[in-house]
Amino acid sequence: MKKFFETIKNIFKIEELRKRLGYTLLLVIIYRLGCFVVLPGIDATMLAKLQSATSQGLVGLLNMFSGGAMGNASIFALGVMPYISASIVVQLLGMFVPYFRKLQTEGESGRQKMNQITRYLTILIICIQGPAYIASLHSQIPAQAFVAVNALGWSNFTYNMVATVIIMAGSLFVMWLGERITDRGIGNGISLLIMIGIVARLPYALIAEFGEKFNTTTSGGALFFVVELLIWFFVIVAAVALVQAVRRVPVQYAKRVVGNRQYGGVRQYIPLKINAAGVMPIIFAQALMLFPILFSRWDATRGLAATLGNYTGFWYNFIFFVLIIIFTYFYTAVTINPTQMAEDMKRNGGFIPGVKPGKKTVEYLDNIMSKVTLPGSIFLGIIAILPAFAILLGVNNQFASFFGGTSLLILVGVILDTLQQIESYLLMRHYDGLMKTGRLSGRSGM
């Protein structure tokens, strides 16, 4: 533990790292303040119905990603979701469209072009989602809440146009904040803003769960709450294991003599991640499962759509689980290219001991990926459906979302990624890092 705190002190001894952390903190504070700035012309005291509607289900998940801005009718209500949607679309285009696939191989210039395309697509998505969100406000909050319409005599059309422009500008500003953090701060800015939004909802969820369990008329509420926290801790540990787990494939490099120096002759490893797809399979699966939820609202007979639309029901979670496994294999197959890996290995004079270069190496890597993807996809599916089980066992909806799913994996993934970036700065300045073989180095002293 002493070593861990010494490492924390070392962080502030590095001027560049200190400035980057300060810059990141400043922009995060600006983002969080903006999440509480209500759209002009709306009475903030009349948002109870909107906050209730955005506290559960898929909308609740989106509200969590925005840090509660969606439920506050904030100028940052759309948050970074338009940018995330655009990034996913561009990423998919890079898998199937030759032009985008070519851009991915052009290094920094190709990356800049793809970033520019992502920005343009973000603006297009904002132009669609902005008016849709303003229209949803009219159905979620009472007409008296629109002060600009009632007191100033504005028409609904005029107010909607002004509010839409403000919402769109707010979302573009959030995108800019994320890019500034990436360039001049620490971590991936967009991911960090999502993580901050999720963390910001955690105290509210804990307070709500604490209140329910301690105000219950039945005995054992306090004990149940403690058990919940213990289970939650083990789920977090499992999520960390899923994000960090890799299968190391040994690679031997042949010796080369250039001039008077000898190169190669060392053994390295290719780290094949157990969950190479990250949270993308959950996002794709949730996008598909949104359709039965939407159709169930108009299904008066409570038939098939209503059955599949029950996100705590058996069939919803069974199909959700199967879709995650399918999408994990699909996304891993299109993002991990064994042929390219084998060619790069051969070009650099490397080979896998006991495996012939070329086709045999491709088959070996493909076989390894298939084997490690199966347990990874099943584990990912289990974590994704844990919130539904938590709700069925009596956990509050808000707190249940932290028991697994996209929010927990994003939380764990972004924190680990940020720690690894800080680690690289420390190691470059010859300080002990925060992490050691994927674990916090300070643990060894506990």
Regions found by a protein language model. Give the residues of each.
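N-terminal cationic and glycine-rich segments that engage phosphates or anionic surfaces
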Residues: 1-104, 109-446
